[in-house]
């Protein structure tokens, strides 16, 4: 059995987990998240803990038990604490402004780039060169952060562009005569 799948999830106070035939719902202060149930994984709830077991002895069911367990754990953490990603803008004149769930980027193009945030995702700019994306759904937070980064990814010679705050850019050496 999967090492991750063996570990139970402790359900904190204030979080309601409901297991139905076709989906698992997690409700908390951060909102409600749903996950489609996989027929290869059995979900058992007892004494404030969730256990995940493969429905049969196949390798696929074993792997899926760990995957589903981690997805549900991310849902529980998301509705209690939430997830956040930080992005930095590096470059002369690069700046960002957030207002009304919209992000306005000026990153060296002839026009500003506007990005609408989906429901459940909030964006803030602490400084004009720092973007903070927050939300309960880990996948959506990461996806929006990747889409923002893709507007102007860091280039390898000067490092200009939009990067994750913990990302290290390896700077290439320029061609010498």
UniProtKB/Swiss-Prot annotation:
One of its GO terms (biological process) is cytoplasmic translation. It comes from the Bacteria. GO terms for cellular component: cytosolic large ribosomal subunit. The keyword rRNA-binding applies. GO terms for molecular function: rRNA binding; structural constituent of ribosome. Keywords: Ribonucleoprotein, Ribosomal protein, RNA-binding, rRNA-binding. InterPro entries: Ribosomal_uL6-like, Ribosomal_uL6-like_a/b-dom_sf, Ribosomal_uL6_a/b-dom, Ribosomal_uL6_bac-type, Ribosomal_uL6_CS. SUPFAM superfamilies: Ribosomal protein L6. Disulfide bonds: none annotated. NCBIfam families: L6_bact (TIGR03654). Belongs to the universal ribosomal protein uL6 family. Part of the 50S ribosomal subunit. This protein binds to the 23S rRNA, and is important in its secondary structure. It is located near the subunit interface in the base of the L7/L12 stalk, and near the tRNA binding site of the peptidyltransferase center. This is Large ribosomal subunit protein uL6. It comes from Variovorax paradoxus (strain S110). The lineage of its organism: Bacteria, Pseudomonadati, Pseudomonadota, Betaproteobacteria, Burkholderiales.
